From Swiss-Prot:
InterPro entries: HD (IPR001356), Homeobox_CS (IPR017970), Homeodomain-like_sf (IPR009057). GO terms for cellular component: chromatin; nucleus. It comes from Homo sapiens (Human). Belongs to the paired homeobox family. SMART domains: HOX. One of its GO terms (molecular function) is RNA polymerase II cis-regulatory region sequence-specific DNA binding. Keywords: Activator, DNA-binding, Homeobox, Nucleus, Transcription, Transcription regulation. Residues 136-147 have a biased composition (Low complexity). It is found in: Nucleus. Transcription factor that acts as activator. The keyword Chloroplast does not apply. This is Arginine-fifty homeobox. Residues 154-163 have a biased composition (Polar residues).
């Protein structure tokens, strides 16, 4: 069976068994010869000819590096030189800028004609002047902020209020400083003065804090009073039972001052400090719940004999 794909009349291959004896071989040409340069130019045609410039010896085309330098120089020449203004021109420009920072086109034309300057130069000057003013304002504001911040750091901060529940008001030292500097006398006392109420948590203050507070306040009375008599008089618990309440550090404020009133032989006991206002009828729980309350003179004074009560009635 004959193959359909095979040609019916096969032709011999032209490159097989070909005789090259009649062919002429072109000898290599010298690149310096003008014929080689002309041939290379003819081979580069159309748009490719611009990119096929061969820098061969004897070629008339300039080198590529020189052309690039020339193009860069031409671009640099396009930038205008810096305009220098005379003193009169500068004053005229500044005067108009002080009036308006955005002059319209008519003002720019008039000013350009008056100063013999191009209108574009006047326009550029105003634009640069606005930028300069904005930059100066930013620098001034930055300096002001830098001056304010160090001054705030140097200001002493006010002491914060102590969050401790043991802090109370008014302070005892402030109370005693408000007393008159003259010698103590019943006629000079303000019997209507009151104490600010304090919560029961004040009695739970630690011993060391009470001792520091008491040490900062001078003793009001010089005569010492027996603490055991106070305990018996006010039905207080034993000293061992109240060690946590720290009443033992307030002995100096539980001292009496004795005065003879109206020629009568009875002496009255006046108590100051935290024990003010306590009567024998009050028990320990009542005292803790009603600490630092204000009482009248008859409630705060206690005589040796309860039957002999003296009402002085001072205002």
């Amino acid at each position: 069976m004959r193959n359909r794909m095979a040609p019916e009349n096969p032709q011999p291959d032209p490159f097989i068994n070909r005789n090259y004896s009649n062919m002429k071989v072109i000898p290599p040409q010298d690149p310096a010869s003008p014929s080689f340069t002309l041939l290379s130019k003819l081979e580069c045609s159309g748009t490719v000819s611009a990119y096929c410039s061969l820098n061969l010896p004897g070629s008339t085309d300039p080198p590529t590096s020189a052309s690039r330098v020339a193009a860069t120089t031409a671009i640099r020449r396009r930038h205008k030189e810096r305009t220098s203004f005379t003193h009169q021109q500068y004053e005229e420009l500044e005067a108009l800028f002080s009036q308006t920072m955005f002059p319209d086109r008519n003002l720019q034309e008039k000013l350009a004609l008056r100063l013999d300057l191009p209108e574009s130069t006047v326009k550029v000057w105003f634009r640069n002047r606005r930028f300069k003013l904005k930059k100066q304002q930013q620098q001034q504001s930055a300096k002001q902020r830098n001056q304010i911040l160090p001054s705030k750091k140097n200001v002493p901060t006010s002491p914060r209020t102590s969050p401790s529940p043991y802090a109370f008001s008014p302070v005892i030292s402030d109370f005693y400083s408000s007393l008159p500097s003259q010698p103590l006398d019943p006629s000079n006392w303000a019997w209507n003065s009151t104490f600010t109420e304090s919560s029961t948590s004040d009695f739970q203050m630690q011993d060391t804090q009470w001792e520091r507070l008491v040490a900062s306040v001078p003793a009001l009375y010089s005569d010492a009073y027996d603490i055991f008599q106070i305990i018996e008089l006010y039905n207080l618990p034993d000293e061992n039972e109240i060690s946590s309440s720290s009443f033992h550090c307030l002995y100096q404020y539980l001292s009496p001052t004795k005065y003879q009133v109206g020629g009568q032989g009875s002496s009255l006991s006046i108590f100051a400090g935290p024990a003010v206002g306590l009567s024998p009828a009050q028990t320990w729980p009542n005292m803790t719940s009603q600490a630092f309350e204000a009482y009248s003179l008859t409630d705060s004074l206690e005589f040796q004999k309860t039957s002999n009560m003296v009402d002085l009635g001072f205002l």
